[in-house]
């Protein structure tokens, strides 16, 4: 019996695969536990349509990620922060992922999730700082920050 796997089944198949399995195994285990469904013409058509829409969405995300990367790597894209500085040359407050994401949105209209900004430790120094950011899967870039004394 041909089935479409709805979830990964160790040793049998991965989600989205169409495979031939013994009829009893399919009916009594895979289908009952919602791990697979019978591969009818309609079900196969739905699977193909779903895979095409996922590929299209993935391609759109890659294109959007590359556009954001180009914006971030432009020479004029430098996120400016004006912070109060103590006598030791360190800022009173620290600059976090959240602050960087908000300023990027406010100053340049570039929306990046704060969880994708990869700051090792909160920034407390004054000057030019490069912060790595993971835009989408394997698309990475650098945000240029300028922290000024205010």
UniProtKB/Swiss-Prot annotation:
InterPro entries: Ribosomal_bL9, Ribosomal_bL9/RNase_H1_N, Ribosomal_bL9_bac/chp, Ribosomal_bL9_C, Ribosomal_bL9_C_sf, Ribosomal_bL9_N, Ribosomal_bL9_N_sf. GO terms for cellular component: ribonucleoprotein complex; ribosome. The keyword NADP does not apply. Keywords: Ribonucleoprotein, Ribosomal protein, RNA-binding, rRNA-binding. PROSITE patterns: RIBOSOMAL_L9 (PS00651). One of its GO terms (biological process) is translation. Gene3D superfamilies: Ribosomal protein L9, C-terminal domain, Ribosomal protein L9, N-terminal domain. One of its GO terms (molecular function) is rRNA binding. It holds the Pfam family Ribosomal_L9_C. The keyword Mitochondrion does not apply. Binds to the 23S rRNA. NCBIfam families: L9. Belongs to the bacterial ribosomal protein bL9 family. This is Large ribosomal subunit protein bL9. It comes from Streptococcus pneumoniae serotype 4 (strain ATCC BAA-334 / TIGR4). The lineage of its organism: Bacteria, Bacillati, Bacillota, Bacilli, Lactobacillales. The gene is rplI.
């Amino acid at each position: 019996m041909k089935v479409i796997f709805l979830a990964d089944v160790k040793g049998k198949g991965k989600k989205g695969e169409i495979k031939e399995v013994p009829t009893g195994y399919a009916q009594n285990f895979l289908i009952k536990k919602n791990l697979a469904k019978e591969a009818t013409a309609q079900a196969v058509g739905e699977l193909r349509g779903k895979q095409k829409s996922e590929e299209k969405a993935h391609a759109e995300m890659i294109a959007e990620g590359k556009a954001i990367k180009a914006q971030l790597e432009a020479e004029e894209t430098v996120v400016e922060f004006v912070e109060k500085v103590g006598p030791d040359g360190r800022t009173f407050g620290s600059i976090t992922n959240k602050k960087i994401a908000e300023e990027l949105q406010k100053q340049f209209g570039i929306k990046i999730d704060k969880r994708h900004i990869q700051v090792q430790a909160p920034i407390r120094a004054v000057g030019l700082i490069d912060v790595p950011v993971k835009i989408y899967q394997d698309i990475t870039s650098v945000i240029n920050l300028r922290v000024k004394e205010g």
